[in-house]
Curated annotation (Swiss-Prot):
Subcellular location per the Swiss-Prot or TrEMBL entry: Cell inner membrane
Alphabetical list of InterPro entries matching this protein: ATP_synth_F1_ATPase_gsu, ATP_synth_F1_gsu, ATP_synth_F1_gsu_CS
Function: Produces ATP from ADP in the presence of a proton gradient across the membrane. The gamma chain is believed to be important in regulating ATPase activity and the flow of protons through the CF(0) complex.
Gene Ontology CC annotations of this record: plasma membrane; proton-transporting ATP synthase complex
Quaternary context: F-type ATPases have 2 components, CF(1) - the catalytic core - and CF(0) - the membrane proton channel. CF(1) has five subunits: alpha(3), beta(3), gamma(1), delta(1), epsilon(1). CF(0) has three main subunits: a, b and c.
GO terms (BP aspect): proton motive force-driven ATP synthesis; proton motive force-driven plasma membrane ATP synthesis
Family recorded in the similarity comment: Belongs to the ATPase gamma chain family.
Protein name: ATP synthase gamma chain
Main location: membrane
Keywords annotated in UniProt: ATP synthesis, Cell inner membrane, Cell membrane, CF(1), Hydrogen ion transport, Ion transport, Membrane, Transport
Membrane topology reported for the UniProt record: Peripheral membrane protein
Residue ranges that the Swiss-Prot or TrEMBL entry lists as coiled coil: none
Amino acid sequence: MPGMKEIKSRIKSVQSTRQITNAMEIVSTTKFKRYSKLVTESRPYEESMRKILGNIASGVKNEGHPLFDGRKEVKSIAIIVITSDRGLCGSFNSSTLKELEKLVEKNKNKNITIIPFGRKAIDFITKRNYEFSESFSKISPDEMNKIAGEISEEVVEKYNNHIYDEVYVIYNKFISALRYDLTCERIIPITRPEVELNSEYIFEPSTEYILSALLPRFINLQIYQAILNNTASEHSARKNSMSSATDNADEMIKTLNIKYNRNRQSAITQEITEIVGGASAL
């Protein structure tokens, strides 16, 4: 049975850990509010872009475009995998990396290039000797849109040059403060959105020109949204994980205090018994 000194030391240790987890919970809550707001505010723009793209695609069903059409034979794919830079967020990153392994295994007969976003993804693919192109980590909020643009330019260019035949992105889609969904989707070639046209469209200067301008922007938007969603989900996961850790620390401190008080009471009782016994002997 541990002594009072040992129990007191454990209480101090748990209290110190609790201060850290509580501070991290507060920081993650602040960041979560910021990124969840960005996700919510940007979704109407994405939905409008998707609707416009659907209208155009439905109006030009007989006209092709490289980013729409795809290839008969897929020999090479690129995978954009998005994780966090830090841990302490439960199974958030491990689930993403397991999904990456599944996609790699499914396409093991193809040439695979991985574009890692986040320190956890970089470390994972480095240990497994996966082939990867440029990597991204420690990206500030102000740089996210710029980086999304760089990635989209790279994958579109390499797709047009037949270096990539398909491009996928793996990330966590933010749903609510308590939920995010692991998502793996193909972003190139783009799946034509199906919408019902109410009227015919006349395209100026040409359909090809409009699609050539719009489709790369749509891919850029998808990558940016994936980064935003994943970051909001990361801070949600860390906030919840640190909240749970803080609650567990409180429970442990309570249990240790009960043990300490019982041991202290037992020691006092024993001391009184010894004094009474000594007095009786006299």
